[in-house]
Swiss-Prot record:
Encoding gene, per UniProt annotation: ybx1
UniProt keyword Cell wall biogenesis/degradation present: no
Domain comment (free text): In the CSD domain, Trp-43 specifically recognizes C5-methylcytosine (m5C) modification through its indole ring.
Task performed by this protein: DNA- and RNA-binding protein involved in various processes, such as translational repression, RNA stabilization, mRNA splicing and transcription regulation. Binds preferentially to the 5'-[CU]CUGCG-3' RNA motif and specifically recognizes mRNA transcripts modified by C5-methylcytosine (m5C). Promotes mRNA stabilization: acts by binding to m5C-containing mRNAs and preventing mRNA decay. Plays a role in the maternal-to-zygotic transition in early embryo by binding to m5C-containing maternal mRNAs and preventing their degradation.
Domain of life: Eukaryota
Marked site positions, Important for C5-methylcytosine-recognition: 43
Record's compositionally biased regions (Low complexity): 133-143, 173-187
Family: Belongs to the YBX1 family.
Protein name from the UniProt record: Y-box-binding protein 1
GO molecular function: C5-methylcytidine-containing RNA reader activity; DNA binding; miRNA binding; nucleic acid binding; RNA binding
Source organism per UniProt: Xenopus laevis
Keywords, in A-Z order: Cytoplasm, DNA-binding, mRNA processing, mRNA splicing, Nucleus, Repressor, RNA-binding, Secreted, Transcription, Transcription regulation
Region span, C5-methylcytosine binding: 43-48
Length: 303
């Protein structure tokens, strides 16, 4: 019995000695315990960058850090291993126990990585907008000199010269043409409003052009619609109507200025006129009485 126990103890010691003698290399300052060990990822935290791998042979949990991953998924931005993924790694001796190093996929392929790890955006490697080339100014000057020489030799028309201009000049008009784009609705609405204004003026004053111009101006700038120009129209129409009425009444009635003068003179002369008027009235009454008395006397004498 004692011999059997001794042989069983010697076998594990021999296995450990072989395992220790096989990996002669070291990873940094850490001693390598085993190489090319297969295991299953128990869990891995992408944010903290560490996790544990369960060895398939000994069912032991081995600590793994993201820096130990040798071949990462090229599509992933961060180094990581996925939960439940089968990986191949080396076991080294760490400060607090066994650690994994040189982590790869089976047979040295890149690991799949965690599904929570961010993907790498390839289009960010190349900028969308690039500056002009270094020899851009020299080429531009050469092009200008060549264009001038061609113009002097062949003397092309204006359309040809515009077509031969460099492309960088064509970029500027769109920036300047944005301003009139914002004003186009006003220009497009202006004639419509002008027609409406002309239709409204045709009922009252079609012959004169001032009201129509004012309406066109209002259509171009609508903020002046509620301003004083609207109040001026009835005044002008009223003045025109007064002028027409005055033209009709000039034949029958004197102008208003003369009326005021007559009334004013009448008020001034009013205190002096009563005496004279009374005297005239008395004289007229006496003469009328005499005239009436004389025919009566003549009639009486005739009888």
């Amino acid at each position: 019995m004692s011999s059997e126990v001794e042989t069983q103890q010697q076998q594990p010691d021999a296995l450990e000695g072989k395992a220790g003698q096989e990996p002669a290399a070291t990873v940094g300052d850490k001693k390598v315990i085993a190489t090319k060990v297969l295991g299953t990822v128990k869990w891995f935290n992408v944010r903290n960058g560490y996790g544990f791998i369960n060895r398939n042979d000994t069912k032991e949990d081995v600590f793994v850090h993201q820096t130990a991953i040798k071949k990462n998924n090229p599509r992933k931005y961060l180094r990581s291993v996925g939960d439940g993924e089968t990986v191949e790694f080396d076991v080294v001796e760490g400060e607090k126990g066994a650690e994994a190093a040189n982590v790869t996929g089976p047979e040295g392929v890149p690991v799949q990585g965690s599904k929570y790890a961010a993907d790498r955006n390839h289009y960010r490697r190349y900028p969308r907008r690039r500056g002009p080339p270094r020899n851009y100014q020299q080429n531009y000057q050469n092009n200008e000199s060549g264009e001038k020489a061609e113009e002097n030799e062949s003397a092309p028309e204006g359309d040809d010269s515009n077509q031969q201009r460099p492309y960088h000049r064509r970029r500027f008009p769109p920036y300047y043409s944005r301003r009139p784009y914002g004003r186009r609705p006003q220009y497009s609405n202006a004639p419509v409003q002008g027609e409406e204004a002309e239709g409204a003026d045709s009922q009252g004053t079609d012959e004169q052009g001032r009201p129509a111009r004012q309406n066109m101006y209002r259509g171009f700038r609508p903020r002046f619609r509620r301003g004083p120009p609207r109040q001026r129209q009835p005044r002008e129409e009223g003045n025109e109507e007064d002028k027409e009425n005055q033209g009709d009444e000039t034949q029958s009635q004197p102008p208003p200025q003369r009326r005021y003068r007559r009334n004013f003179n009448y008020r001034r002369r009013r205190p002096e006129n009563p005496k004279s008027q009374d005297g005239k009235e008395t004289k007229a009454a006496e003469t009328s009485a005499e005239n009436t008395s004389t025919p009566e006397a003549e009639q009486g004498g005739a009888e």
